[in-house]
Design a protein with these regions (language model features):
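A structural "domain/chain start" motif
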Residues: 5-8, 15-57, 170-178
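C-terminal/domain-edge helix-coil "capping" segments
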Residues: 115, 134-178
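Short acidic low-complexity segments
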Residues: 64-75
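Soluble non-cytosolic domains of exported or imported proteins
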Residues: 45-54, 97, 101, 143, ...
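Surface-exposed short loop/turn segments
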Residues: 78-147
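N-terminal secretory signal peptides that target proteins for export/translocation
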Residues: 1-2
Length: 178
């Protein structure tokens, strides 16, 4: 009985404070049919593919929107990779890197369903470890594998997209309030 009472008051507090999920707030701005694309950098096409995969997954899973062709889309989001950096964050006792932080900055050009263009820069980070040391031997392989690199950029791009959605949700909240 006490558990039900606590759950009831918890739900009442959340509803009473005006909480709305991001997908509801962005519904005002981002239409059901969304076209997404990532401008592929010729100097680093592998990063572009990882970002494009993370970007598309985030639109489908986080916004519950359908991907469509550019001609059928009501909302268009074009991502341009501004910067991808791997920063060493941890070293083993021999001085070799064993953890990195991937930092991804993406310049989003968004055409809203209202036709209004927006330019938003968002960043994302992803941490990963490289534990390849065996017992007390010095193992100098602190090289980032292609799979580690892809996964880190993929996760960082999803975090960047979350920042974009948060900024769009804030804009949607302001529009609804006015």
């Amino acid at each position: 009985m006490l558990k039900k009472l606590i759950i009831f008051f918890g739900v009442l507090m959340i509803l009473g404070c005006g909480y709305k999920p991001v997908s509801v707030l962005t519904k005002e701005i981002i239409a059901e049919k969304v076209y997404v694309d990532v401008v592929i950098k010729k100097s680093d096409p592998a990063n572009s593919v990882a970002i494009k995969d993370g970007f598309r997954e985030a639109v489908i899973k986080r916004l519950n929107r359908d991907l469509s062709s550019q001609s059928d889309a009501d909302t268009v989001i074009i991502a341009n990779i501004a910067n991808v950096v791997f920063v060493p964050t941890s070293f083993d006792r021999f001085g070799f890197v064993n953890a990195y932080e991937a930092q991804v900055s993406i310049d989003y050009k968004v055409k809203l369903s209202s036709g209004e263009p927006l330019n938003i820069i968002a960043t994302g980070k992803s941490y990963f470890r490289m534990n390849r040391q065996v017992l007390d031997t010095i193992y100098t392989d602190s090289v980032i594998t292609n799979q580690d690199r892809y996964n880190a950029i993929f996760e960082a791009s999803k975090e960047s997209f979350d920042e974009l959605i948060a900024k769009l949700a804030l804009k949607g909240y302001k529009l609804k309030k006015d």
